[in-house]
Amino acid sequence: MEALLEPVVQLFGPAWPAVWTLTKIVAIIAPLMLCVAYLTLAERKVIGYMQVRIGPNRVGPKGLLQPIADGMKLLFKEIIVPTGASKGLFILGPILAIAPSLAAWAVVPFGEGMVLADVNAGLLFLLAITSVEVYGVIIAGWASNSKYPFLGSMRAAAQMVSYEVAMGFALICVLLISASLNLTDIVRSQGQGQFHEMGLSFLSWNWIPLFPMFIVFLISGIAETNRAPFDVVEGESEVVAGHMVEYSGMAFALFFLAEYANMILVSILTSVLFVGGWLSPVSFLPDGFFWLALKTAFFLFVFLWARATFPRFRYDHIMRLGWKVFIPITLVWVIVVAVWMMSPLSIWK
């Protein structure tokens, strides 16, 4: 590989490290955007089948070109800025929403050595960068100078902060048993132990000893992304479309892309942190990216399944679930895991 790249390295000279990093960024973001586009089609198809409908089937064979048509439509639509809006902040809102969604992928490993930035504080970076997104939502709601976007953005801020706390405590449990903030090390730590040696690798993954945290993390991830049944932020019957009411064209599309990119991010993080990432469930099958993609696809299906199945929760119920149920459970489980690790019954020695 190095021999093949040698002429290119000589061509760019001192600029090669920057060019190589940029190439890796494009290699992550381009497929991600394609996945986001076709996730919208998958969502419409899955929900259609659940409601005994066909879903999109007109644009291209079996409707496969529908996401391209939707993207082109949004690309050529005018971005209308309301008269009373703060124009600079109005445009900044969608950018602040999508930037953290893309930046978070820098520390996500796709396989052994397949990561853009293999930093030791990857988990901490993820917590920090994903919490920035709420500022984009708040700015969008405030800059629109309209009551519905403002109400929606306040709801979003309260909801995202509430569930970030529970997710943070769930991640502390993962940190305790993995003894590392590096996501690659967390996956490696799930590939060892008695069950792994017996060939039943899936029994050594974190989802079994941390099952309550696994459920809390997944549900909190759905709430963090403002997806149904936690979509009170854009409840059509209450606040029309929340903070996105006044947006059109590509400005609206950026919020849309951020939401679906976050869905994929939460799904892949759940796979990496709790179900072994790219590790094979049984020892006689090889590890690889295929397993990570399969697990991520399953969790994405859970997102779509939840949307098609559950009615929207009332806002006070969502707040109560976050503060009075999830946070106490995660706090107790952090203590349980810490005591369990110190006891003679520890399974992590």
UniProtKB/Swiss-Prot annotation:
Assembly description: NDH-1 is composed of 14 different subunits. Subunits NuoA, H, J, K, L, M, N constitute the membrane sector of the complex.
Q: Say what the protein does.
A: NDH-1 shuttles electrons from NADH, via FMN and iron-sulfur (Fe-S) centers, to quinones in the respiratory chain. The immediate electron acceptor for the enzyme in this species is believed to be ubiquinone. Couples the redox reaction to proton translocation (for every two electrons transferred, four hydrogen ions are translocated across the cytoplasmic membrane), and thus conserves the redox energy in a proton gradient. This subunit may bind ubiquinone.
Please report which protein family the annotation says this sequence is part of. Belongs to the complex I subunit 1 family.
Q: Name one GO molecular function term.
A: quinone binding
Q: Per its record, how is this protein called by name?
A: NADH-quinone oxidoreductase subunit H
Q: Which reaction does it catalyse?
A: a quinone + NADH + 5 H(+)(in) = a quinol + NAD(+) + 4 H(+)(out)
Enzyme class label: translocase
Source organism, top-level taxon: Bacteria
Q: What is its EC number?
A: 7.1.1.-
